From Swiss-Prot:
One of its GO terms (cellular component) is plasma membrane. This is Alanine dehydrogenase 1. Pfam families: AlaDh_PNT_C, AlaDh_PNT_N. Gene3D superfamilies: NAD(P)-binding Rossmann-like Domain (3.40.50.720). It is an enzyme of class 1 (oxidoreductase). Keywords: NAD, Oxidoreductase. It catalyses: L-alanine + NAD(+) + H2O = pyruvate + NH4(+) + NADH + H(+).
Length: 372
């Protein structure tokens, strides 16, 4: 199987889907690997480093001729022209956010494997490290954009406690998963107060025990509680994600209007559509805008801003799956590995993820029924 590592075209995206170390694992297993020129530069990997591990450096167009194309984020619309029948595209594709790319993949007969929908032992194994990074960085961005020079309230999130008692900021975090706890931990490290809004009762108990000795309040998620707590936020971070599907707009414009002027609103799951009515995708180079008096931060690829860290995390997570596909062939790998099967969103043009099908009102078939 010919495997290609392509350079990301998304603005500000410095990650690469495969490290030189992982290229060596593939070539040692007898697979041919091509790497687009400068694909790894943003993460600190030169073309020479890939060549030394057995890869051939190629052009963008040549990379897309491969049987298996390994990416970080969804293909750019300029890359749709390179799709070919039975080609496998691997990455954090977030297909629920764009019906156009799904229809193009269906038309051509592409197979799409989305890392964010791979579930192992009930957990989003590949997404978790990226969620952790996005959560931590969101807390930092909230502090940064709280400063007056960036349009914020002009507050120092840590407060001041030397001979005076000026309280720190309040972070309201919507959701209680990996991204949420990582955001909360950074906020606590900044001496901020944290309110977590979570739906699941078992998770609420877990969070209450986890933060029993911290300045954290855990609140049951209801529309009424959300509307009440968001008014307290100096920084509001939504972490709600439904793997493979678009989440509902749970944070309404009226709720945003009720927030403090100059407060900061961040949606970590904006790459899947987000839960906030007033938010739209932004970029790492132009990350914020003001609406209803609130600073909106809608960067969909936050880990791409810290590529040296995030590339190592994602590459460590995906290499075993990629090796299994290359060694066994996709169909056998799917049959042998239940977690991998959950990542197949489209198989040769057929939608095989129920959440994705529901998001775009498309026909759904279970993956094992399609390949048998």
């Amino acid at each position: 199987m010919l495997v290609a590592v392509v350079k990301e075209l998304k603005q500000g995206e410095g990650r690469v889907a495969c490290t030189p170390e992982n290229v060596r694992k593939l070539t040692d297993a007898g697979h041919k690997v091509i790497v687009e020129k400068n694909a790894g530069i943003g993460s600190g990997f030169s073309n020479d480093m890939y060549e030394k591990e057995g890869a051939k450096i190629v052009t963008h167009e040549q990379a897309w001729e491969a049987d298996l194309v390994i990416k970080v984020k969804e293909p750019h619309e300029s890359e749709y022209q390179y799709f070919k029948k039975n080609q496998i595209i691997w990455g954090f594709l977030h297909l629920a956010s764009s019906k156009e790319i799904v229809e193009k993949m269906q038309e051509v007969g592409v197979t799409a494997i989305s890392g964010e929908t791979i579930i192992k032992n009930g957990k989003a194994e590949l997404l978790a490290p990226m969620s952790a990074i996005a959560g931590q960085r969101s807390a930092i961005m909230g502090a940064y954009y709280s400063e007056a020079q960036h349009g914020g309230q002009g507050t120092l999130v840590t407060g001041v406690h030397e001979n005076v008692d000026i309280p720190g900021s309040t972070y309201v975090i919507f959701g209680g998963g990996v991204a949420a706890t990582n955001a909360a931990n950074v906020a606590l490290g900044l001496n901020a107060k944290v309110i977590i809004i979570e739906l699941n009762d078992d998770r609420i108990k877990y969070l209450q025990d986890m933060y029993a000795e911290k300045d954290v309040t855990v609140v049951k998620s209801t529309p009424e509680n959300l509307a009440e707590q968001i008014k307290k936020a100096d920084v509001f971070i939504s972490t709600i994600l439904i793997p493979g599907a678009k989440p509902p707009k749970l944070v309404t414009r009226e709720m945003v209007k009720s927030m403090k002027k100059g407060s900061v609103l961040i949606d970590i799951a904006i790459d899947q559509g987000g839960t906030i009515e007033t938010i739209r995708p932004t970029t790492i180079s132009d990350p914020v805008y003001e609406e209803e008096g609130v600073i909106h931060y809608g960067v969909p690829n936050q880990p791409g801003a810290v590529p040296r860290t995030s590339t190592m995390a994602l590459a460590q997570g995906n290499i075993d799956y990629i090796l299994e596909i290359c060694d066994k062939g996709l169909e056998q790998a799917i049959k042998d590995n239940e977690a991998l099967s959950t990542g197949v969103n489209i198989y040769q043009g057929q939608v095989t993820n129920q959440g994705l099908a529901s998001s775009h009102d498309l026909d759904y078939k279970e993956i094992l029924n399609v390949i048998e």
